[in-house]
């Protein structure tokens, strides 16, 4: 006779097995109507699953994160239901949940068009509005296989043959005449699945293997209510306006082309942003006492075999050969930094040694995964490695954390989610070493008053790590910063120092990245600011323009003064109407426009306008220069008078 303990500690006694739905109904009809699933003894189960022993139970509704995920998963099944009605010969592969939605990989005898997607979405809505019950049946492996063989679902049969044990009991979910297989849980009724939209299609190889057949992947988004769906679609619309690829072209920052996939051709203005970002990072390296080094971008394969990268990472590495030797173009900087550390005998007095590099790295990313500046093959890491003793780890991690927040705040990123990944099952190093390392990371976060969550077992085999994920103005997550302890690489590459006891010891290595890659971070900044870069990093900070030819000499003189003051400035002396010039430079997101007419020439002043259309009136030239220098020097996010 099960006793069910609820989250508030109250208990309900039953004289027979019950389901989460039964318990919800016992509490009240309102809760029963809202019930999507249950969490029994910490495990998610369907609303209909029996509870036969004393258990803890949480009712899952659409307000819960798990509830929303279940809705999305059930919408994938709804897609399967609809597509089989429209094109009965479709073979269904897999349909998991992803961020903000779901997808289904399907094998179809024609390429889906936008008209097909519209028809599919319409049929999904028609089916969902029937509010039919979803029926779950646990069956034997053999019965499940027979079901899908009869239906010609070869991919489901393959999953059963290769991924599910013969003594397992797969869950079959019946959507009227359509049957899908899943661990679940799923919604009990399709009334929960009314707020969705199909978004796009893409190609995807079965099981991610390019030797297998290319399937069509249909992406969708799903939400608990109409308001949340509309808000998400509005965010997507705003994101499309901010797309760094579109703005990059509009502002002439960079381009990419077929002959160099995933490689950036930086134009003058984009390269100006890149170099300003480098200058900013360099200023922080100096402040936090780092050395800056530069390693070769290509090293012998033998070295990468020593590090373990060749065994674990070779598919992502570009290689070349010369004089019967094979070389790898570096995908990361760390092995090169150990080589620099190894030059000359090191003492404990030399530690900590902080080594930074703007490392030019290359990774052989799949062509289908490339995306503007966000996913490239050639990129520049703001990478650093700290060699230290075990006793120095906590202080060094502390400094890394301060540096991360210091740099992110410069760009206005305030929402940062922090996760601490702990020891995986397969690892090197003693439990004592891991205990200390994990404690050092946790204490460093606590000392900086930073809330964090643990990712148990998600650390690398060679050490625990902290991940920093920043959220932009559209609440999109970007994982950029990492502080990773490494007990393995220094040992593999024979790094050592002479300790206080006059014996050789292996240093702890801390991998530290803040921006991640400069290319990707510029993409993030472009979308965060919609191309309205803060003045200090804007490619052109000021345009000086005349109204008639009679002010040309004054404009040139003023331009020289601004250049001498360290301000990036252009003169626009074209024979165009002043309104045309202002509009053009406003569209180019130039922070300031200085207009010179006869009145300004006579008074030795300029009329100042911002790219947001604000007229700051007439100002002395010296005052303008002083204010601009202050804004640039302080790396302010605000313009004058804001």
UniProtKB/Swiss-Prot annotation:
InterPro entries on file: aa-tRNA-synt_IIb (IPR002314), aa-tRNA-synth_II (IPR006195), aa-tRNA-synth_II/BPL/LPL (IPR045864), Anticodon-bd (IPR004154), Anticodon-bd_dom_sf (IPR036621), Beta-grasp_dom_sf (IPR012675), TGS (IPR004095), TGS-like (IPR012676)
Annotated stretches, region: Catalytic: 243-534
CDD domains associated with the record: TGS_ThrRS, ThrRS_anticodon, ThrRS_core
Catalytic activity: tRNA(Thr) + L-threonine + ATP = L-threonyl-tRNA(Thr) + AMP + diphosphate + H(+)
Record localization: Cytoplasm
EC number(s) recorded for this UniProt protein: 6.1.1.3
Annotated Zn(2+) binding sites: 334, 385, 511
A Pfam family it matches: HGTP_anticodon
GO function terms (MF aspect): ATP binding; metal ion binding; threonine-tRNA ligase activity; tRNA binding
Domain TGS: residue ranges: 1-61
Job description of the protein: Catalyzes the attachment of threonine to tRNA(Thr) in a two-step reaction: L-threonine is first activated by ATP to form Thr-AMP and then transferred to the acceptor end of tRNA(Thr). Also edits incorrectly charged L-seryl-tRNA(Thr).
Protein name as annotated: Threonine--tRNA ligase
Organism encoding this protein: Klebsiella pneumoniae (strain 342)
Native organism taxonomy: Bacteria, Pseudomonadati, Pseudomonadota, Gammaproteobacteria, Enterobacterales
């Amino acid at each position: 006779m099960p006793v069910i303990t609820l989250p508030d500690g109250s208990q309900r006694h039953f004289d027979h097995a019950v389901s989460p739905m039964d318990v919800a109904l016992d509490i009240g009809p309102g809760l029963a109507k809202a019930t999507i699933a249950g969490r029994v003894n910490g495990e998610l189960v369907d609303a209909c699953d029996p509870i036969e022993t004393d258990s803890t139970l949480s009712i899952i509704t659409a307000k819960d994160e798990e509830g929303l995920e279940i809705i999305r998963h059930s919408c994938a099944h709804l897609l399967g239901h609809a597509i089989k009605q429209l094109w009965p010969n479709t073979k269904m592969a897999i349909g998991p949940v992803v961020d903000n939605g779901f997808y289904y990989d399907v094998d179809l005898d024609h390429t889906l068009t936008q008209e097909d997607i519209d028809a599919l979405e319409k049929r999904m809505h028609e089916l969902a509005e029937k509010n039919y019950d979803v029926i779950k049946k646990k069956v034997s492996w053999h019965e499940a296989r027979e079901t899908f063989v009869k239906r010609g679902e070869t991919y489901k049969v393959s999953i059963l043959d290769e991924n599910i044990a013969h003594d397992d009991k797969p869950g079959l979910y019946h959507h009227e005449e359509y049957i899908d297989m899943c661990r679940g849980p799923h919604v009990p009724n399709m009334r929960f699945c009314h707020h969705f939209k199909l978004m796009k299609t893409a190609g995807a190889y079965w099981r991610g293997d390019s030797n297998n057949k290319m399937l069509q992947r249909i992406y969708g988004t799903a939400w608990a209510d109409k308001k949340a769906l509309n808000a998400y679609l509005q965010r997507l619309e705003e994101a499309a306006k901010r797309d760094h690829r579109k703005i990059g072209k509009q502002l002439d920052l960079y381009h990419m082309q077929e002959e160099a996939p995933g490689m950036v051709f930086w134009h003058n203005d984009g390269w100006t942003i890149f170099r300003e970002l480098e200058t900013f990072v360099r200023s922080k390296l100096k402040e936090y006492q780092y050395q800056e080094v530069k390693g070769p971008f290509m090293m012998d394969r033998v070295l990468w075999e020593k590090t373990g990268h060749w065994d674990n990472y070779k598919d992502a590495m570009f290689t070349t050969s010369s004089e019967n030797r094979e070389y790898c173009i570096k995908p990361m900087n760390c092995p090169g930094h150990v080589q620099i550390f190894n030059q000359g005998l090191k003492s404990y007095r030399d530690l900590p040694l902080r080594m930074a590099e703007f490392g030019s790295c290359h990774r052989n990313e799949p062509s289908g995964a490339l995306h503007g500046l966000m996913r490239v093959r050639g990129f520049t890491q703001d990478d650093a490695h700290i060699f230290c003793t075990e006793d120095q780890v906590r202080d060094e991690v502390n400094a890394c954390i301060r540096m991360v927040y210091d740099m992110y705040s410069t760009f206005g990123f305030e929402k940062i989610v922090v996760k601490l990944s702990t020891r995986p099952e397969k690892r090197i190093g003693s439990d004592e070493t891991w205990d200390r390392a994990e404690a050092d990371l946790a204490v460093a976060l606590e000392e900086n008053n930073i809330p964090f969550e643990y990712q148990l077992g998600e650390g690398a085999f060679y050490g625990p790590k902290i991940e920093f994920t920043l959220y932009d103005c559209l609440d999109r997550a970007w994982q950029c910063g990492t502080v990773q302890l490494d007990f393995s690489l220094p040992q593999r590459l024979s790094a050592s120092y002479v300790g206080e006891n006059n014996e050789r010891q292996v240093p702890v290595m801390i991998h530290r990245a803040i921006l991640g890659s400069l290319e990707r971070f510029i993409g993030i900044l472009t979308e965060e600011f919609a191309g309205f870069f803060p003045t200090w990093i804007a490619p052109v900070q000021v345009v000086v323009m005349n109204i008639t030819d009679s002010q040309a000499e004054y404009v040139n003189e003023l331009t020289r003064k601004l250049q001498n003051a360290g301000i990036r400035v252009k003169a626009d002396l074209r024979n165009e109407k002043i309104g045309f010039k202002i509009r053009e430079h406003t569209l180019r997101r130039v922070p300031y426009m200085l207009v010179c007419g006869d009145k300004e020439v006579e008074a030795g002043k300029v009329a100042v306008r911002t790219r947001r259309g604000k007229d700051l009136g007439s100002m002395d030239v010296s005052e303008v220069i002083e204010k601009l220098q202050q804004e640039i020097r302080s790396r302010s996010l605000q313009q004058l008078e804001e």
